Amino acid sequence: MEKERDVAQEQATYEQESPNAERQEELKENEHQEKNAPEEQEKVREENGRQDAQKDEIGDPEKAKEEQNEELAAANAKIAELEAKIKEMENRYLRLYADFENFRRRTRREMEAAEKYRAQSLVSDLLPVLDNFERALKIKAEDEQAKSILQGMEMVYRSVLDALKKEGVEAIEAVGKPFDPHLHQAVMQVEDSNYEPNTVVEELQKGYKLKDRVIRPAMVKVSQ
């Protein structure tokens, strides 16, 4: 009997304590929710932000297409501008290259001409000397002494001609040749039945060439 009374007392005590335990659990749950409320709110805001961003990205299809077309047009315009600049630079390069090639060829020709005709100035200075030799050698010697002098002059004259010949200097052929204004300088026209018209009949002064360049044309008489 006493044992049954103890069990009943324990049951009553449990029933009294149960509401208090449930209340404590409820309070703990509320406290936990209050503590985590800011975090939950932040998560909600982030989720809403993501949804808004997705909506913005999707946006109006027509507007998005228009923006794409504008971007494409701007890109095409930039490409066209760059292509025009490249074309301009290519043309400038080609012009510079052509100018350089012309300069290089001209310089090479000038250097070759300078080497080829390096003796021209000296030859031009020697021509009056040759003229004097030729005039002196036409003099008829009256005695042995004069003949000896003329022979010595002729030797010197021949030596000078040989030296000039080694440099490419040669006399221009004149008498009996058709008149050539590039080689001959006509100072007189005469009638001469021994020659065809427009033929050199007499040479008044020798002409000379340095290789293929006329240093001095021959001074001549030409038949009519």
UniProtKB/Swiss-Prot annotation:
<comment type="function">
    <text>Participates actively in the response to hyperosmotic and heat shock by preventing the aggregation of stress-denatured proteins, in association with DnaK and GrpE. It is the nucleotide exchange factor for DnaK and may function as a thermosensor. Unfolded proteins bind initially to DnaJ; upon interaction with the DnaJ-bound protein, DnaK hydrolyzes its bound ATP, resulting in the formation of a stable complex. GrpE releases ADP from DnaK; ATP binding to DnaK triggers the release of the substrate protein, thus completing the reaction cycle.</text>
</comment>
<dbReference type="InterPro" id="IPR013805">
    <property type="entry name" value="GrpE_coiled_coil"/>
</dbReference>
<feature type="region of interest" description="Disordered">
    <location>
        <begin position="1"/>
        <end position="72"/>
    </location>
</feature>
<feature type="compositionally biased region" description="Basic and acidic residues">
    <location>
        <begin position="20"/>
        <end position="67"/>
    </location>
</feature>
<dbReference type="InterPro" id="IPR000740">
    <property type="entry name" value="GrpE"/>
</dbReference>
<protein>
    <recommendedName>
        <fullName>Protein GrpE</fullName>
    </recommendedName>
</protein>
<dbReference type="GO" id="GO:0051082">
    <property type="term" value="F:unfolded protein binding"/>
</dbReference>
<keyword id="KW-0963">Cytoplasm</keyword>
<comment type="similarity">
    <text>Belongs to the GrpE family.</text>
</comment>
<dbReference type="GO" id="GO:0042803">
    <property type="term" value="F:protein homodimerization activity"/>
</dbReference>
<dbReference type="Pfam" id="PF01025">
    <property type="entry name" value="GrpE"/>
</dbReference>
<dbReference type="InterPro" id="IPR009012">
    <property type="entry name" value="GrpE_head"/>
</dbReference>
<dbReference type="GO" id="GO:0005737">
    <property type="term" value="C:cytoplasm"/>
</dbReference>
<feature type="compositionally biased region" description="Polar residues">
    <location>
        <begin position="10"/>
        <end position="19"/>
    </location>
</feature>
<keyword id="KW-0346">Stress response</keyword>
<dbReference type="GO" id="GO:0000774">
    <property type="term" value="F:adenyl-nucleotide exchange factor activity"/>
</dbReference>
<keyword id="KW-0143">Chaperone</keyword>
<dbReference type="GO" id="GO:0006457">
    <property type="term" value="P:protein folding"/>
</dbReference>
<dbReference type="GO" id="GO:0051087">
    <property type="term" value="F:protein-folding chaperone binding"/>
</dbReference>
<comment type="subunit">
    <text>Homodimer.</text>
</comment>
